[in-house]
UniProtKB/Swiss-Prot annotation:
Part of a stress-induced multi-chaperone system, it is involved in the recovery of the cell from heat-induced damage, in cooperation with DnaK, DnaJ and GrpE. Acts before DnaK, in the processing of protein aggregates. Protein binding stimulates the ATPase activity; ATP hydrolysis unfolds the denatured protein aggregates, which probably helps expose new hydrophobic binding sites on the surface of ClpB-bound aggregates, contributing to the solubilization and refolding of denatured protein aggregates by DnaK. Changing E668Q: Decrease in ATPase activity. ATP 1 binds at G198, E199, P200, G201, V202, G203, K204, T205. GO terms for cellular component: cytoplasm. It comes from Thermus thermophilus (strain ATCC 27634 / DSM 579 / HB8). The gene is clpB. The lineage of its organism: Bacteria, Thermotogati, Deinococcota, Deinococci, Thermales. Changing G167C: Great decrease in chaperone activity. Retains ATPase activity and oligomerization. CDD domains: AAA, RecA-like_ClpB_Hsp104-like. This is Chaperone protein ClpB.
């Protein structure tokens, strides 16, 4: 026995048989050990060979395992070191068979032939030899890795035409133009290799699946009838190719098989760019170069699919590129997407066991097109339908909220009952009786509701079964019509099909008024998924939200005092957006806030973010003092290629990509470099911006606020002279025109001039600032009370028409917070104290009324 003349796989099988014998503590390696190794996997070569020869590999495997269990166990160093004479004879016979078959190496299939001769109850040698020839495709074993080239197409490819015949592919709606163009190229004499090029998610693979379905139906020209489309899996080809030349050998076997089929097989490679450089190593040939000769001669027909960006990989190799004919696949329109979804609807209904309404389909196409901008139709719309249906299915399979709430209440009462059982006083006993009565009532109610829910679920289960049967019957009709079994087709179409359709309709009708089972995916479900993905509120306005929007001014006034014009302008823009009346191609609103420092420009932006999103974190704040130099502008959209930081993207674009629905504040806009305004023009007009990576970022769901101190001296001067608000506004506008270009000012929705704060407004701000301080003190369980005189004192000290409300914060810090902090540290004010503040001759006076001890 010469192991040098065995293939790698055969040597490995023998080594594994030895390991098995050692692990099971058997004296020697015998036939059952080798059989157990060879039949370990259903996809193994031995298993496939025995199946082809008409044997039952599963029964053989079980028989050999029983035989292994019967072998005696031994101890010592000699375990599993020898071959039995039976196995030794079989291995020598394998070498003789190798000569007979004109092979250079003993392969795994040759071993199977030799072992089968030595094992009773298996097919004869001639039957096995016939199966072996079929499996090898008429080739002999000339290399050490020959097994990986057997039946290469079956091993490394997926037959799409077979899947289409079995009804396992989704229907392909539309795309007739592209399919016709692919057929046209495939029918050419040479260079008959179409490559589908398009953005991810537009349906390139679906076009090939559509072609496979047409071939199965016979709806193709004569030259393509009866052909097979096999999808080549590059991953499978590369996986496990450990040795130099093994990958090339596998690919060569695939190419050979396709060439030998004489045009019967059309190869399909998804992600075609992977063939460039696949298997490339030092001195090795990559897949692209191996495919070139067969492609050029027209011996091999290949359909490729790749994205626009990745097609560049193929363009780098002009000799490979010229062998392909590009077919550009555009993104379908919203209307075409709706047709595609209507065609797919049934598949998803059967899979999830729910109904998908037509309004949900229209919503999926329109909302995904409008709000999910980084992905393509129809993929993103299909994903929405799929996820909404999965969500409804999950809700159907878990206990309804009504029952869940009652069960939780019952559990709470049971815990209470157990605690009361230990008490002996009359009150507790009385309470115990009441609880037991309530538990009994709840148990009865839960049982009644559960029975109703179970009844509805049973109807739902029957409905799903009927839908699956209906799907199978439709597939059978299609198959019968293809095979011209018209009697069977008529029997199913006019007998079985109407019966099942009526059953599905009747069961659906029963569930229509169901209490717990909601069977239909609606427009609202789709809107909720979009909101979940993007953070943009697109679902219907709930009553609470309507109230909030109608009272938006009140909400904003809780934190921003005065400035009615600014608050009204912002609130109106938000209401227009949520009512669906805003221009879909522009931001929700763009405002320029002007006015002296400290009057609430930045505070209004923060308040808006907190009101809309319940957190100030939803505000993207860009401080324009950081963008005073020309080179700093690139930080907004990202550094250009080749510069440090290119990979990180822009500070503005990345923030908006992560949170498309937000308030963007450009603070102190007049301090920015003029080039920043060129970037803003695009955002304000088109609601979009392209970053340094070429990605389009959507600003259509943002509120853009720019603040500036320009014209502040004019505003103060005007107020001192008693000018009306309109005149002040006009004067400030003149200053703006000197500083900003007309095309920038013209794109803003509104330019709002903030008024300086009056004494009365400062007094209101004192209350707001004190509420923040009280909230901080509440954490220490200290309450704070100020007399009206103390509040007036703070307002008087903090009033400055030039600096706005900011001096007030400093006064509160100095006059109130600092003395209070000293008293807390000195122990004069402790947890649980009530601090009263009044005005004395020297400033504020603090008093702590005597604590009442509990």
């Amino acid at each position: 026995m010469n192991l040098e003349r065995w293939t790698q796989a055969a040597r490995e099988a023998l080594a594994q048989a030895q390991v098995l014998a050692q692990r099971m503590k058997h004296q020697a390696i015998d036939l059952p050990h080798l059989w157990a190794v060879l039949l370990k996997d259903e996809r193994s070569l031995a298993w496939r060979l025995l199946e082809k020869a008409g044997a039952d590999p599963k029964a053989l495997k079980e028989l050999q395992e029983r035989e292994l269990a019967r072998l005696p166990k031994v101890e010592g160093a000699e375990v599993g070191q020898y071959l039995t004479s039976r196995l030794s004879g079989a291995l020598n016979r394998a070498e003789a068979l190798m000569e007979e078959l004109k092979d250079r190496y003993v392969a795994v299939d040759t071993l199977v032939l030799a072992l089968a001769e030595a094992t009773p109850g298996l097919p004869g040698l001639e039957a096995l030899k016939g199966a072996l020839k079929e499996l090898r495709g008429g080739r002999t074993v000339q290399t050490e890795h020959a097994e990986s080239t057997y039946n290469a197409l079956e091993q490394y490819g997926i037959d799409l035409t077979r899947l289409a015949a079995e009804g396992k592919l989704d229907p392909v709606i539309g795309r007739d133009e592209e399919i016709r163009r692919v057929i046209q190229i495939l029918l050419r004499r040479t260079k008959n290799n179409p490559v589908l090029i398009g953005e991810p998610g537009v349906g390139k693979t679906a076009i090939v699946e559509g072609l496979a379905q047409r071939i199965v139906k016979g709806d193709v020209p004569e030259g393509l009838k009866g052909k097979r489309i096999v999808s080549l899996q590059m991953g499978s080809l590369l996986a496990g190719a450990k040795y130099r030349g093994e990958f090339e050998e596998r690919l060569k076997a695939v190419i050979q098989e396709v060439v030998q089929s004489q045009g019967e097989v059309i190869l399909f490679i998804d992600e075609l760019h992977t063939v460039v450089g696949a298997g490339k190593a030092e001195g090795a040939v990559d897949a692209g170069n191996m495919l070139k000769p067969a492609l050029a001669r027209g011996e091999l027909r290949l359909i490729g699919a790749t994205t626009l960006d990745e097609y560049r990989e193929i363009e780098k190799d002009p000799a490979l590129e010229r062998r392909f004919q590009p077919v550009y696949v555009d993104e379908p329109t919203v209307e075409e997407t709706i047709s595609i979804l209507r065609g797919l609807k049934e598949k998803y209904e059967v899979h999830h066991g729910v109904r998908i309404s037509d309004s949900a389909i229209i919503a999926a196409a329109t909302l995904s097109h409008r709000y999910i901008t980084e992905r393509r139709l129809p993929d993103k719309a299909i994903d929405l339908i799929d996820e909404a249906a999965a969500r409804l299915r999950m809700a159907l399979e878990s206990a309804p909220e009504e029952i869940d709430a009652l069960e939780r209440k019952k559990l709470q009462l049971e815990i209470e009952r157990e605690a009361l059982k230990k008490e002996k006083d009359p009150d507790s006993q009385e309470r115990l009786k009441a609880i037991e009565a309530e538990i009994a009532k709840l148990t009865e109610e839960i049982a009644k509701l559960r029975a109703e829910w179970e009844r509805e679920r049973e109807i739902l289960r029957k409905l799903r079964e009927a839908q699956h049967r209906l799907d199978e019957v439709r597939r059978e009709i299609e198959l019968a019509e293809r095979q011209y079994d018209l009697n069977r087709a008529a029997e199913l179409r006019y007998g079985e099909l109407p019966k099942l359709e009526a059953e599905v309709e009747a069961l659906s009708e029963k569930l229509r008024g169901a209490r717990f089972v909601r069977l239909e995916v609606t427009e609202e479900d789709i809107a909720e998924i979009v909101s979940r993905w993007t953070g943009i509120p697109v679902s219907k306005l709930l009553e609470g939200e309507r109230e909030k929007l109608l009272r938006l001014e009140e909400e904003l006034h809780k934190r921003v005092v005065g400035q009615d014009e600014a608050i009204r302008a912002v609130a109106d823009a938000i209401r227009r957006a949520r009512a669906g009346l805003k221009d879909p191609n522009r931001p929700i609103g763009s405002f320029l806030f002007l006015g002296p420092t400290g009057v609430g420009k930045t505070e209004l932006a923060k308040t808006l973010a907190a009101t809309l999103f319940d957190t100030e974190e939803a505000m993207i704040r860009i401080d324009m003092t950081e963008y005073m130099e020309k080179h700093a502008v690139s930080r907004l959209i990202g550094a250009p290629p080749g510069y440090v930081g290119y990979e990180e993207g822009g500070q503005l674009t990345e923030a908006v990509r992560r949170r498309p629905y937000s308030v963007i504040l450009f603070d102190e806009i007049e301090k920015a470099h003029p080039d920043v305004f060129n970037i803003l023009l695009q955002i304000l007009d088109d609601g979009r911006l392209t970053d340094s990576h070429g990605r389009t970022v959507d600003f259509r769901n943002t509120v853009i606020i720019l603040t500036s101190n320009l014209g502040s001296p004019l505003i103060l001067e005007g107020l001192q002279k008693g000018w009306p608000y309109e005149r002040i506004r006009d004067e400030v506008f003149k200053v703006l025109q000197q500083h900003f270009r007309p095309e920038f000012l013209n794109r803003l929705d509104e330019i709002v001039v903030f008024r300086p704060l009056t004494k009365e407004q400062i007094r209101q701000i004192v209350e707001i600032q004190l509420s923040y301080l009280r909230a901080r003190l509440a954490e220490k369980r200290i309450s704070l009370e100020l007399t009206e005189a103390a509040k007036d004192f703070l307002a008087e000290r903090g009033y400055d028409p030039v600096f706005g409300a900011r001096p007030l914060r400093r006064v509160i810090q100095r006059e109130l917070e600092t003395p209070l902090a000293q008293k807390i540290l000195a122990g004069e004010v402790k947890e649980g104290d009530r601090v009263q503040v009044d005005v004395g001759p020297a400033g504020l006076v603090f008093a702590v009324p005597a604590r009442v001890e509990a």
